[in-house]
Amino acid sequence: MHNTIYEISDKPIPKNGRATVGNLPAWFFDSVSDGACEISDDDREQEINRLAHCLGSSCTWDGKKLMLSPEIRQEYFKGAFKYFKKAASALAETEYAVFSGAVPSVAFDLALQGMAESYSDRFGAYVYDPGIEELFPLDTWIRSADVSKPYYVGGAIDYHY
């Protein structure tokens, strides 16, 4: 399976300064990805358009900058929140013996995994912030993005898992 890492900054990123696979932290390859490669300039535009489409009507991409509307969080997380609530409800009914591991339960494991993934998809898209040299799941980045300012997309990196 494949997904994309988007280099996103609140400052323009020059083409010759775009992130490469070498900028990605070791933990990412230890726990998420088994390989990655930079995306060509032609495919980069397609990937940025795919990101804008994924973010929906609460995002605009004008070819230079990405703008997020104040409604981005309300719109983007609607579907995931339904799964989160369903998993939380299932977990709320868990007996202590299952929670402690004394009684194995595949249903419990799946609900716990589903709740975590609905909050932040470990195998989804990522954002690399060159200003702080950190990598975040897209979900985490959206939760903390400042919607009052534009964002610029530098490199795009394909990763597989």
Annotate each PLM feature.
Residues M1, S118-Y161:
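Acidic, proline/glycine-rich low-complexity IDRs
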Residues M1-G35, K149-Y161:
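Short, extreme N-terminal segment that most often corresponds to the first beta-strand
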Residues P12-P14, P25, P70, P104, ...:
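Proline-rich intrinsically disordered, low-complexity coils
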Residues T20-V21, C54, G101, L112, ...:
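Intrinsically disordered, low-complexity regions enriched in Ser/Pro/Gly/Gln/His and often acidic
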